[in-house]
Amino acid sequence: KLGQLYPNQKVLLVDAQLAGEGASSRNSGYLVDTTLNDGFTSNKELENYKKKADIYKIGIKAVKKFIKEHQVDCDWNECGKYFASSKIQDENILENFSKTLSKLGFENEFIYKNDLSNKLGTKFYNVAIYTKGGILIHPGKLVRAMIDTLPKNVYLFENTPLINWQKKRNSIKCQFKNSHVQADKIIF
């Protein structure tokens, strides 16, 4: 995205290993619209949660647009997400979370042991909230597609672990095994 926003700037992506081949890329991944919270004590906290949820929504929309534009097969599955617990005493936490979700307009459903085991295929969990907004993807496939479509001003350096970094006046110097980079702005 930075390459698109700043087409006249060089953008370097540096990965310690092959991009899209790390542990997170080998697992299933979720794009989420909500994260678990057991309730809020103030309207300010609720506003902050809503801001986070809005960011998640923007992210999901951007990824969906990308996979459509580039016809990416990343096993996109709008299956929703379960916030589940094996402890029945966690029902109160989930009730508070359900109230928060409802206040913010997120559909959610309480599911208990028998129905839950039918849906999940295990009797381990006792209680859960189901939300529709979670999307299961294969992150490795998505990352590799993003790598294949990098803008011309974005350069990828793989198998390049960061050895050291230090701030020098108005810039940051990053030291790698056989090279270094000095830049005004760096995102770690």
Give the label of every model feature segment.
Residues 8-10, 71-73, 105-107, 153, ...:
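A generic structural signal for alpha->beta connector loops
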Residues 3-26:
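Glycine-rich FAD pyrophosphate-binding loop
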Residues 188:
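Flavin (primarily FAD) binding-site architecture
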Residues 56-63, 143:
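Short, hydrophobic/amphipathic alpha-helical packing segments
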